[in-house]
Design a protein with these regions (language model features):
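Extended, low-polarity transmembrane helix blocks
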Residues: 1-40, 46-54, 58, 65-126
């Protein structure tokens, strides 16, 4: 009955790209605007927070525009691996922490980034 919809799967991947890019752009802006304050909250050097914000923003733009799409998706997946590792290893946060932000959303963004990496090619593929 719905088998004919598979011809439109590119629309679903594009919608995923837009949503993932929007999330990463929104989360990159505080790192770009106030890296010193974010660094204190994250326990990272301010230069690393600024670099993280640049990677998140540039990769998100690449994902939504389809420029170096696979590279951008891979970079965002790496960011999420780092976020998950930090939450589990350094901060000892559980998957769904009632008093903190757990890492379930990070895992979802990691999976979405990998779906984009494996299923899509953009204007300038890499």
């Amino acid at each position: 009955m719905l088998t004919g919809l598979s011809q439109y799967s590119f629309i679903a991947v594009f919608l995923l790209r837009v949503v993932v890019a929007t999330i990463f752009i929104v989360h990159s802006l505080p790192k770009l605007r106030n890296s010193e304050k974010m660094a204190k909250g994250l326990g990272m050097p301010s230069g690393a927070v600024l670099a993280l914000g640049i990677v998140e923003f540039a990769s998100a733009v690449g994902i939504v525009l389809g420029i170096f799409l696979r590279l951008a998706a891979l970079l965002l997946a790496a960011v999420m691996v780092g976020a998950i590792a930090t939450k589990i290893g350094r901060w000892k946060v559980s998957f769904t922490a009632p008093d903190k932000t757990g890492w379930e959303f990070d895992l979802l963004l990691l999976a979405a980034s990998l779906v984009i990496f494996f299923s899509a090619s953009g204007i300038i593929g890499f």
